């Protein structure tokens, strides 16, 4: 039935009320100042019996740090349930962060709760009960990984419960504050009195704003009054001392306290010019609570009407959203409308008879998502060309990037796998309803560098095809309907720190914040369309000047859209002019085919065949090498080790790509033999970090040896490349834009320098670990310069063995003898100092303590030490024992996953 919602607040209290015959209810909130606790009281009217769910996501970190990578930040949240006091606690590992705790005021209530949102995915939640757990949890939860505080009460007549939330410096402090809060009585405070003037002003602001723009000439009349001209302006002409002035001031203050930006200008018509009684009257009205807002941007100004020219007064009348006179202000008696965005139809669950655990099917060329089945997590798909790409899921259009998926996101990004994120939407309007065509799709196919969403609305089928252009920095979207021409819309979110304008039917936009790589984004539509930047105007036809979206809207049965980026405005317009010229998805298919090896695995296991024949090569080429991004993390940079690892796969399908990348990596090596751990292209030059990592540089000689073995192209060894130049870092790493050397050396010498740089060993004769090895998360184990890595030691021996044929090819017998001896010494040290009963250990830290041994309380077994021992030595008694130990300890049969190591680090600070 019809439901209306109201919200009131005053000081430290608020109230939300639902007025519905079906379910009238309210939530009242307050702060218990004596114990620094938030209290939320719920109740439903009448004799209804109900349960109440209360949930939030604990962050416990500074917003900017959390926002930089929410999923990574969430890994460090832990939960603990005190069953005696019935309090749920949250903390962030590492110290220096606040604690958080939640409880019910009534200790007789035994609630259900969860501290983790692993079971929640936006497109699988059909009702609120899906958010809450099925049983009461016991204490001792530990790491949450994906934290969520969700509490569900038992049924109670009247639905009256009080939830208490507090923060403190320790678990003990939180407990004490909640215990004090439980002794308090919840009393609803009086909320602020109604303010119909503020309601009227808000309604005019949302619905009555004119289209008058603000030029520099126009704005000068506001700037001289210290008004900004960038927020909505209300103007009142004052002819006499009247209560209308105080009502206007009260409306202004109410909007300010509700965080609604506005400016207020009083134009005074003085009859007595010398004494100015009207100005004095207004100043007297504003001496107290309004004083902080006087004559400043976003505030209140008083000016003589005679000081404005006739043209300026005419401009103010056109520009102001509310222009009134002090003797003619009206107070409406009827309720005023507020803009409520229409519901955009998305996921609608279907009922199936058979039990289904997975909603995806696979074959040798792609993935099919069938919406008749359940999905417990999003399935993501990366599409990329040489200059741009996109990450989508089976229910959303994700985000678009230009060149660098981290630094140059054309549309907004959210890596939260549990949310329904819509940075871009393609929406169809049919019979007054709006449908998100990705979220509403009944079938999604990821195949050959394309995503195809299909379904039907009101009996009319549709198909939405998405792909990245191979050479153009753009992503295209082709939409086709059968037998109907709906309103088709491409909608992009627009934040407050973005600027945008329309140039010949093309949206151009850029980020006003400082960016390491500045760029201009663009959006284009193939058809004649309306360009809109206001969601209220797009959906309701009312220009509220919200400036919250960029959108195209057209009525057609077939349309193409494009989104992309370029270094500047003119370049963006040139690229846009080349987009939306027909179906060019064939070039995306050809690009993918070029980078997928022609071999096919035939093992008798269809899933395994699909993995090795298509999925792994596709992920390697498109997601890792060209896109350098995924759903969870958008790196955007070249990783020295990362993309060289990918070359071991790419060499089978695109050896020329591998050749170019080997030369690129040589150009990012220092003369000392170490390398830039990662870097990205910036206007001032390639920028990244120089580290003391122990293994990344070893992938250069390994990849070169593999490339020559697979292609026979030994000429690459004679190509001369320069080095990066800077002082070696004193500590673990340094972020820099280094210079380039004038001198050059052959690729072969680059490889020799890499091997020579890896010769350094510690007290046990093993390779020094430095600031990390393959596992970047172990960055503190050897940061003091004494820790040793068993993994890097095995890797060094393996690389020397693989590079030996290249040294023979170059007839470099001195290097052959030297590195053979170094390798033999490492193997001897490994067998003497790195085998612990039934496993190879992982490392020695700076203090000489064993990591990955039988007696290690954390990380007692690590897969890398066993795997690389077997890869290097083959089948020996010790390698078989190590692999068996790792299999028993690390393989999770239920999840069918291998842990990297176990138990996880909890007390020992391994780094990262």
What is the role of each PLM region?
Residues 1-641, 656, 661-664, 706-711, ...:
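Anionic coordination/interaction segments
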Residues 226-230, 244-247, 471, 635-642, ...:
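Secondary-structure capping and boundary motifs in well-ordered enzyme cores
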Residues 632-636, 676-695, 723-742, 768-787, ...:
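Carbohydrate-binding/catalytic loop surfaces
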Residues 255, 647-658, 662-765, 790-797, ...:
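Aromatic-rich carbohydrate-recognition surfaces in CAZymes
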Residues 676-677, 795-910:
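Catalytic cores of carbohydrate-active enzymes
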Residues 171-172, 710-719, 738-739, 802-819:
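Inter-helical turn/loop segments and adjacent helix faces that build the functional surface
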Residues 199, 229-232, 589-614, 618-627, ...:
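Aromatic-lined, polymer-binding surfaces characteristic
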Residues 26, 150, 202, 539-542, ...:
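Long, charged, mostly alpha-helical binding arms that flank functional sites
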């Amino acid at each position: 039935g019809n439901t209306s919602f109201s919200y009131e607040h005053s000081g430290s209290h608020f109230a939300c009320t639902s007025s519905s015959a079906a379910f009238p209810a309210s939530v009242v909130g307050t702060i218990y100042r004596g114990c620094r606790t938030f209290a939320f009281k719920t109740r439903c009217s009448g004799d209804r019996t109900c349960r109440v769910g209360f949930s939030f996501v604990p962050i416990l970190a500074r917003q900017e740090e959390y926002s930089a990578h929410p999923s990574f930040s969430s890994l460090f949240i832990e939960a603990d349930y005190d069953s005696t006091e019935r309090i749920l606690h949250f903390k962030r590992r590492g110290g220096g962060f606040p604690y958080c705790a939640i409880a019910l005021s009534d200790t007789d209530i035994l609630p259900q709760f969860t501290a983790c949102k692993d079971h929640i995915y936006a497109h699988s939640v059909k009702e609120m009960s899906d958010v809450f757990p099925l049983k009461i949890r016991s204490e001792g939860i530990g790491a949450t990984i994906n934290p969520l505080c969700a509490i569900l009460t038992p049924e109670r007549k009247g639905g009256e419960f009080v939830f208490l939330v507090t923060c403190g410096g320790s678990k003990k402090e939180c407990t004490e504050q909640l215990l004090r809060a439980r002794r308090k009585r919840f009393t609803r405070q009086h909320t602020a009195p109604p303010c119909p003037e503020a309601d009227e002003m808000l309604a005019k602001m949302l619905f009555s704003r004119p289209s008058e723009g603000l030029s520099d000439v126009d704005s000068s009349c506001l700037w001289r009054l210290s008004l900004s001209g960038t927020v909505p302006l209300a103007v009142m002409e004052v002819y006499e001392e009247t209560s209308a002035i105080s009502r206007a001031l009260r409306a202004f203050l109410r909007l300010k306290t509700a965080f609604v930006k506005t400016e207020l200008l009083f134009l005074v018509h003085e009859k007595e010019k010398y004494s100015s009684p009207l100005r004095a009257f207004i100043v007297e009205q504003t001496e107290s609570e309004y004083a902080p807002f006087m004559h400043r941007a976003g505030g209140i100004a008083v000016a003589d009407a005679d000081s404005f020219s006739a043209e300026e007064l005419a401009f103010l009348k056109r520009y102001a959203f509310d222009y009134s006179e002090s003797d003619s202000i009206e107070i409406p008696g009827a309720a005023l409308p507020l803009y409520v965005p229409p519901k955009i139809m998305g996921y609608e669950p279907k009922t199936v008879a058979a039990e289904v655990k997975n909603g995806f099917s696979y074959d040798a060329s792609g993935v099919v998502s069938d919406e008749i089945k359940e999905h417990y997590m999003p399935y993501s798909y990366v599409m990329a060309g040489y200059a741009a790409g996109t990450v989508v899921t089976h229910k959303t259009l994700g985000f678009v990037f230009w060149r660098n998926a981290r630094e140059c996101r054309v549309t907004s990004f959210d890596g939260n796998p549990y949310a329904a994120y819509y940075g871009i939407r393609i929406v169809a309007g049919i019979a007054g309803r709006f449908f998100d065509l990705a979220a509403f799709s009944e079938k999604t196919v990821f195949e050959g560098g394309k995503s195809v969403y299909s379904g039907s609305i009101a009996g009319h089928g549709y198909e939405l095809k998405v792909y990245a252009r191979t050479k153009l920095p753009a992503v295209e979207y082709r939409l086709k309907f059968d037998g109907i021409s709906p309103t088709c819309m491409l909608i992009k979110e627009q934040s407050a720190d973005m600027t945008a304008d329309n140039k010949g039917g093309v949206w151009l936009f850029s980020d006003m914040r400082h960016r390491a790589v500045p760029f201009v984004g663009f959006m284009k539509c193939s058809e004649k369309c309306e360009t809109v930047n206001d969601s209220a105007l797009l959906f309701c036809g009312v220009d509220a000047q919200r400036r919250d979206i960029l959108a195209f809207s057209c009525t057609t049965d077939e349309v193409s859209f494009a989104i992309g980026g370029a270094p500047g405005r003119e370049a963006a317009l040139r690229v846009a002019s080349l987009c939306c010229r027909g179906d060019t998805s064939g070039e995306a298919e050809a690009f993918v085919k070029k980078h997928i090896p022609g071999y096919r695995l035939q093992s008798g296991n269809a899933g395994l065949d699909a993995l090795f024949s298509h999925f792994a090569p596709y992920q390697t080429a498109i997601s890792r090498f060209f896109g350098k991004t995924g759903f969870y993390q958008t790196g955007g940079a070249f990783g020295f080790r990362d993309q060289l690892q990918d070359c071991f796969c790419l060499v089978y399908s695109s050896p020329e790509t591998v050749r170019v990348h080997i030369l690129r990596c040589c150009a990012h090596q220092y003369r000392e033999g170490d390398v830039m751990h990662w870097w990205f292209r910036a206007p001032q030059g390639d920028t990244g970090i120089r580290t003391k990592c122990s293994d990344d540089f070893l992938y250069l000689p390994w990849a070169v040896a593999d490339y020559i073995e697979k292609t026979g192209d030994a000429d690459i060894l004679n190509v001369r490349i320069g080095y990066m130049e800077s002082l070696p870092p004193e500590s673990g790493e340094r972020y820099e834009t280094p210079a380039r050397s004038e001198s050059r050396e052959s690729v072969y010498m680059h490889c020799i320098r890499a091997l020579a740089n890896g010769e350094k060993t510690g007290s046990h004769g093993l390779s020094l670990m430095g600031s990390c090895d393959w596992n970047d998360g172990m960055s503190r184990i050897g940061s003091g310069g004494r820790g040793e890595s068993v993994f890097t030691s095995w890797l060094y021996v393996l690389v020397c063995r693989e590079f030996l044929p290249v040294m023979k090819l170059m007839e470099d017998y001195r290097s052959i003898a030297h590195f053979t001896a170094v390798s033999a010494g490492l193997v001897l040290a490994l067998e003497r100092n790195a085998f612990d009963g039934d496993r190879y250990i992982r490392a020695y830290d700076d203090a000489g303590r064993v990591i990955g041994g039988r007696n290690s309380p954390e990380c007692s077994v690590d897969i890398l030490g066993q795997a690389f021992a077997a890869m290097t030595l083959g089948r020996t008694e010790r390698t078989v024992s190590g692999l068996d130990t790792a299999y028993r300890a690390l393989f999770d049969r239920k999840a069918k996953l291998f842990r990297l190591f176990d138990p996880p680090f909890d007390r020992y600070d391994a780094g990262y």
